[in-house]
Design a protein with these regions (language model features):
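A nucleotide- and high-energy phosphate-metabolite-utilizing enzyme signature
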Residues: 1-317
Length: 317
């Protein structure tokens, strides 16, 4: 699909740039430094949209001392700057905001530092976030971090308190992240029954049941939905509703970006502007006169998906 293809391109850009920095810097330094990256979020799940940032973590081997970590920080900072200016039309935006301690945390950590943080201080949302971690390239250190997350996330089912914390966090996201002045139903990602509802439901089911079933340990939303169906966690009708809404929502997001341009604001919102709505509808295969049919289909699909979400998300035990 498009999301996976975009990830292939992104992987090639990021890994090539990182390798170039390695070659350039190691020509100046006596001691080689090898930085590896792990993808998170939609990047980790291979579900990128056209305007997605690339959420990543940077990791180095435990043998790195303070001087090596300083060099690694400088190199990653330059890598971010290089990629962000690589294209005016669609820059490659590396985002490290999901790293331990957020913006106040180190850009680069050793493997041991990551594992110690997650074992001792991580919050439940960080465990949920790590479900979509993917090692970039073939490096041993990034793969070791991935292997750790598989054990960490699926060591045991969520406790009742952890489940409740995720549920409350979803309430806060719904209340705080949808911009004012927008009909929530028109927000493809964050609106009721939208892509976020599907993702949160899938991840909660994975965290609850993945410790007993390794087939549920996938970063792909599509694959996770299918595995949840096969294991009786979703009925056939629930699966079909979630899968079809997910696919339709992703198609709408891509059409919205193409119709409005990558720099346009509100790219996850079905537009009220007739000209933009017509352009979006025609990209989706509708005629000019069928633009309202596209909107109606989304409203119907997301409403039914919200019913599935309400039934399952608040009653997981």
């Amino acid at each position: 699909g498009v999301g996976r293809d975009l990830c292939v391109v992104a992987d090639a850009c990021v890994l090539s740039a990182l390798e170039a920095f390695d070659l350039f810097d190691e020509s100046k330094e006596q001691i080689p430094l090898h930085i590896e990256l792990c993808a998170l979020g939609s990047y980790g799940a291979r579900e990128l949209s056209y305007t997605s940032d690339l959420d990543v973590l940077a990791v180095v081997a435990d043998s790195c001392d303070a001087n090596a970590l300083r060099r690694a920080h400088e190199r990653i900072t330059r890598l971010k700057q290089l990629l962000s200016t690589s294209s005016r039309a669609l820059p490659v935006a590396l985002d490290f905001a999901l790293r331990p301690e957020g913006k106040s945390g180190a850009l680069v950590r050793t493997l041991e530092s990551y594992t110690e943080y997650y074992e001792r201080w991580a919050q439940v949302w960080e465990k949920q976030m790590l479900l979509r971690l993917r090692a970039l390239g073939a490096g041993n250190t990034a793969d070791a971090l991935y292997q750790f997350t598989q054990t960490y996330c699926f060591r045991s089912p969520l406790s009742d308190d952890e489940t409740r914390e995720i549920q409350l966090m979803k309430v806060r996201v719904e209340r705080e992240r949808i911009p004012g002045g927008i009909d929530p139903r028109m927000h493809i990602k964050l609106g009721p029954g939208g892509l976020s509802d599907i993702q949160w439901l899938v991840e909660l089911l994975q965290l609850q049941s993945g410790s007993a079933d390794c087939n549920l340990r996938t970063s792909s939303t599509r694959q996770a939905l299918l595995e949840l169906l096969h294991r009786g966690k979703l009925t056939q009708s629930e699966y079909q509703r979630a899968a079809s809404t997910w696919e339709f929502g992703q198609e709408l997001r891509r059409a919205r970006v193409i119709a409005a341009g990558p720099s346009a604001s509100k790219n996850d919102v079905i537009p009220s502007n007739t000209e933009q709505l017509v352009a979006m509808a025609m990209l989706m295969g509708y005629s000019r006169d069928q633009r309202e049919e596209m909107t109606t289909k989304w409203l119907t699909s997301s409403r039914k998906m919200r019913e599935v979400f309400e039934k399952l998300f608040w009653n997981i035990s």
